[in-house]
Design a protein with these regions (language model features):
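Non-cytosolic membrane-interface motifs at loop->transmembrane helix junctions
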Residues: 68-79, 130-138, 197-207
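A generic, lipid-embedded transmembrane alpha helix
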Residues: 46-65
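Hydrophobic transmembrane alpha-helical segments in integral membrane proteins
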Residues: 1-23
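Membrane-interfacial loop-to-transmembrane alpha-helix junctions, especially the N-terminal start
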Residues: 39-49, 103-109, 170-174
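C-terminal transmembrane-bundle signature of multipass membrane proteins
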Residues: 149-152, 172-232
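Alpha-helical transmembrane segments in multipass membrane proteins, preferentially the mid-helix core
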Residues: 26-29, 91, 121, 142-164, ...
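Internal transmembrane alpha-helix with an interfacial aromatic "cap," most often the third helix
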Residues: 28-34, 63, 69, 78-111, ...
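Membrane-helix boundary/juxtamembrane motif in polytopic membrane proteins
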Residues: 105-107, 133, 154-179
Length: 232
């Protein structure tokens, strides 16, 4: 049982611990705040809370896996991403629908397909089911599909016709996907180029901390602003 405790100086284990606690705290925050905003925003905050809840549970398992094995919890991490990343993509769709944006189901399907391509090939590369760099390249194609859809596709065009506050939040969310998500391929490359699982896991943990929590905070900020004095 002693192996289940963090070893002093294990910075990777510490990063797993910090992210797991941050995810749990964020979940409580998002779910509580969802009770104080307009009804049309409650689903968005519920989804944000689900993202951090699922991530928090998986990080608890990933932390223990790392402490015991001192190796990358690939399966746990990708199971987490297969659940949470599609939920993040759903947020784009929900926000536009909440403000009456004209966006069809096709937009969501393209975001979903891009997400699955990105994750499935990323996992295949890291798990050794195909060439490491081939999996990386094919996964990047999925990311490119997502970027196109939220910038130049139907979702991006629907956001452009929305209110200024929605455009501001949507742009911030797009920047997270464009810039914040770039941390993930950096971690993927670091796992091979720098030859260490420590670098890969710390970078991945940092990316999840920034992208999942900050993503939800942007939605919360928009929901509170739009709710105004009606929030209670």
């Amino acid at each position: 049982m002693d192996k289940m405790f963090l070893v002093q100086g294990d910075m990777v284990g510490v990063s797993f611990w910090l992210v797991s606690i941050a995810m749990v705290a964020s979940t409580v925050f998002f779910l509580y705040e969802g009770l104080r905003v307009k009804p049309q925003w409650r689903l968005s905050l519920l989804v944000a809370g689900l993202v951090t809840l699922v991530a928090g549970v998986h990080y608890d398992y990933m932390r223990d896996f790392w402490v015991v094995n001192q190796s990358t919890p690939i399966d746990y991490r990708y199971i987490d991403w297969l659940i949470t990343v599609p939920l993040l993509m759903i947020e784009f769709f929900i926000i536009l629908r909440a403000v009456g944006g004209a966006v069809g189901a096709g937009s969501f399907m393209r975001l979903l397909v891009g997400t699955l391509v990105m994750l499935v090939f990323g996992y295949a590369g890291e798990a050794g089911l195909m060439g490491y760099w081939l999996g990386f390249g094919l996964g990047m194609i999925g990311w490119a599909v997502i970027i196109y859809e939220i910038y130049g596709g139907e979702a991006g065009k629907a956001a452009a016709s929305s209110s200024e506050s929605v455009q501001s939040a949507f742009n911030a969310m797009r920047w997270i996907v464009l810039v914040g998500w770039a941390i993930y391929p950096i971690g993927y490359v670091a796992g091979a180029a720098l030859g260490g699982e420590n670098n890969l896991n710390i970078i991945y943990n940092l990316a999840d901390f920034v992208n999942k929590i900050l993503f939800g905070l942007i939605i919360w900020n928009l929901a509170v602003k739009d709710s105004g004095d009606t929030a209670h």
